């Protein structure tokens, strides 16, 4: 082996500068190896991928959503109706009519068609009188509430006193649908006699 001084002479001044530059670069570089950095960043990526749900794995829902679903599932039909109505009001959702069957899209109508339709609409009310009605309770006097609840229980099939009370507390409510005119007027008179305000639709 050659002594250190001799090896420096063999390398020459250029190689000595390169060596100094390499040493300086090593001092300025972070102490972490590039290969180690690659391994750790790929490890982080694999952790992120491992945490992501797979397509065939069941989705995990937050506890807040699970509790909300359980609460909605435990509601009665009257409460669901109220929830639906309140959500429509809160979110400003308008009722949408049914789509016509067969993919028919309403389009522009000629000027002659509205005139003939108007004539038909005038004839229909003259020829046909309504025979069936929906009895709807719109208001209840607080004083006569107990009598009204008992009377509603008589006219609504399959309802108990607790359900009748909830019905009276969440007005307006439909009492009976598709009822003959005579029976609808009888129900209206009975409910108004015990303090209810009834509308026939």
Curated annotation (Swiss-Prot):
Q: Which GO terms describe its biological process?
A: mitochondrial transcription; mitochondrial translation; positive regulation of DNA-templated transcription
Query: What InterPro entries does UniProt report for this protein, alphabetically?
Result: Ribosomal_bL12 (IPR000206), Ribosomal_bL12_C (IPR013823), Ribosomal_bL12_C/ClpS-like (IPR014719), Ribosomal_bL12_oligo (IPR008932), Ribosomal_bL12_oligo_N_sf (IPR036235)
Range of residues in the leader sequence: none
Q: Pfam families attached here?
A: Ribosomal_L12, Ribosomal_L12_N
Task: Tell me the residues on which N6-succinyllysine occurs.
Answer: 153, 165, 181
In chain numbering, cross-link Glycyl lysine isopeptide (Lys-Gly) (interchain with G-Cter in ubiquitin) is at: 153
Gene Ontology terms: cellular component:
mitochondrial inner membrane; mitochondrial large ribosomal subunit; mitochondrial matrix; mitochondrial ribosome; mitochondrion
Description of post-translational modifications? Two mature forms are produced by differential two-step proteolytic cleavage. Cleaved by the mitochondrial processing protease to produce the long mature form and subsequently by the mitochondrial intermediate protease to produce the short mature form.
Q: Where are the N6-acetyllysine residues found in this chain?
A: 128, 141, 145, 147, 153, 166, 176, 181, 188
- Say which domain of life the source belongs to: Eukaryota
Q: For this protein, what is any one GO molecular function term?
A: structural constituent of ribosome
**Subcellular location, in the record's words?**
Mitochondrion matrix
Alphabetically sorted, this entry's keywords are: Acetylation, Isopeptide bond, Mitochondrion, Ribonucleoprotein, Ribosomal protein, Transit peptide, Ubl conjugation
Region span, Disordered? 37-60, 109-130
**Known SUPFAM superfamilies for this protein?**
ClpS-like, Ribosomal protein L7/12, oligomerisation (N-terminal) domain
Q: Where is the transit peptide?
A: 1-38
Q: How does it assemble?
A: Component of the mitochondrial ribosome large subunit (39S) which comprises a 16S rRNA and about 50 distinct proteins. Interacts with NOA1.
Family, according to the entry, reads as follows: Belongs to the bacterial ribosomal protein bL12 family.
Q: What does this protein do?
A: As a component of the mitochondrial large ribosomal subunit, plays a role in mitochondrial translation. When present in mitochondria as a free protein not associated with the ribosome, associates with mitochondrial RNA polymerase POLRMT to activate transcription. Required for POLRMT stability.
PANTHER family named among the record's database cross-references: 39S RIBOSOMAL PROTEIN L12, LARGE RIBOSOMAL SUBUNIT PROTEIN BL12M
Q: Which HAMAP family match?
A: Ribosomal_bL12 (MF_00368)
- Name the chain's protein: Large ribosomal subunit protein bL12m
């Amino acid at each position: 082996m050659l002594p250190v001084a001799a090896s420096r002479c063999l390398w020459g001044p250029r190689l000595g500068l390169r060596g100094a530059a390499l040493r300086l670069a090593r001092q300025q570089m972070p102490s972490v190896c590039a290969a180690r950095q690659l391994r750790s960043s790929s490890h982080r990526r694999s952790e992120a991928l491992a945490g992501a749900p797979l397509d065939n794995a069941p989705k995990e829902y937050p506890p807040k959503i699970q509790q909300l679903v359980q609460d909605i599932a435990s509601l009665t039909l009257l409460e669901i109706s109220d929830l639906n109505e309140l959500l429509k009001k809160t979110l400003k959702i308008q009722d949408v009519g049914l789509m016509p069957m067969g993919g028919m899209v309403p389009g522009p109508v000629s000027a002659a068609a509205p005139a003939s339709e108007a004539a038909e609409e005038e004839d229909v009310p003259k020829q046909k009188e309504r025979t069936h009605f929906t009895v709807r309770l719109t208001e209840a006097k607080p004083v006569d509430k107990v009598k009204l609840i008992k009377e509603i229980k008589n006219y609504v099939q399959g309802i108990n006193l607790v359900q009748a009370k909830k019905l009276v507390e969440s007005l307006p409510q439909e009492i009976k649908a598709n009822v003959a005119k005579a029976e609808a007027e009888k129900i209206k008179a009975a409910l108004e006699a015990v303090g209810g305000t009834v509308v026939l639709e």
